[in-house]
Amino acid sequence: MFSWLLRIASACLGPARRYARTRKDEDGGDNGGGVADGLLWSRDLGRHAAGEFSFAVVQANEALEDHSQVETGSAATFVGVYDGHGGADAARFISDHLFAHLIRLARESETVSEEVVRGAFSATEEGFLTLVRRTQFLKPMIAAVGSCCLVGIIWRGVLYVANLGDSRAVVGYLGRTNKITAEQITRDHNACKEEVRQELISRHPDDSQIVVLKHGVWRIKGIIQVSRTIGDAYLKRREFALDPSITRFRLSEPLRRPVLTAEPSICTRVLSLQDQFVIFASDGLWEHLTNQQAVDIVYKNPRAGIAKRLVNTALKEAARKREMRFVDLKKVEKGVRRFFHDDITVVVVYIDHELLQEKNVSVPELSVRGFVDSVGPSRISGFDAIS
């Protein structure tokens, strides 16, 4: 049923080589399929200060646009999921700079707070816009590159989560009946949400084109679905206007005021004994799984490889929607694969409360990057200096 689409896509995009830095899914995955997926990378289980984590990424685009990181150490845990669009420049920039800004601001303030997190987002946005300003003459399309940004920090028993865009953090907690329950603690900044459209309309009452229904999808200015991002400079400042001959990003009139913002939604949660784990994932996962489905999978299965299990479950659902077999989907090359699903990043962070209460937990200071097999040292010791 899908062969006609695959042939068309292949003709348009051409053959593609495997991404060289993947740790390939050599055994065909943890939940069936029988064929290795060379576009799937995973770190099945690692340690953090308050428990364990599992990490997986699957590539769909010709060039992976998701960047991600987990920073571990004895003082804190940091998770970042950066879902790029229009290219990987913004997501890569966030991965290289946001955590450093967070450490610097936390040390200056001698605490971690919503204000510190907000400041780290602002500094990252300004840094990327400065990069756009410096390079736009040679690389004009960098003004159209942006990224969603989802960040989680666990510090002294408190979870701080901040997001721009439609990546999502979901807590799995035990309710009164001891049943695992999903609680989304982020807000989807996507024009498909009525409240987001109303927010945009209230900010732009004189712009009848601020949200447009195009081919059944609500888009801001008829172009983009997400309302809060890092980057997308041409939708924030007139100085970054693109050549109007570029039809994909053409605005019906010059920008009067920013139509996108980099103001994150922030949630602060004191972790309770009922909180079992947190799932951080780009929207590629949530396109195919509900919050409760994802939480049930994590709760009912072993920890090792759970992020990969979530990714594979989403891929199976993507295959089912296209009336194709999962084993056939895994044979589809990057680039062509984007016709079937998006890049997907998943980090599952387990909360072990006995560790959460300990003050002298010894955890290696490591920086784990999505789709990169080598593990480097982390700067997370910067949190140690906070009194």
UniProtKB/Swiss-Prot annotation:
Its EC number is 3.1.3.16. It catalyses: O-phospho-L-seryl-[protein] + H2O = L-seryl-[protein] + phosphate; O-phospho-L-threonyl-[protein] + H2O = L-threonyl-[protein] + phosphate. InterPro entries: PP2C, PP2C_BS, PPM-type-like_dom_sf, PPM-type_phosphatase-like_dom. Mn(2+) 2 binds at D83, D283, D342. It holds the Pfam family PP2C. GO terms for molecular function: metal ion binding; protein serine/threonine phosphatase activity. Keywords: Hydrolase, Magnesium, Manganese, Metal-binding, Protein phosphatase. Mn(2+) 1 binds at D83, G84. CDD domains: PP2Cc. Its cofactor is Mg(2+); Mn(2+). Residues 52-351 form the PPM-type phosphatase domain. GO terms for biological process: regulation of intracellular signal transduction. Binds 2 magnesium or manganese ions per subunit. Belongs to the PP2C family. This is Probable protein phosphatase 2C 25. It comes from Oryza sativa subsp. japonica.
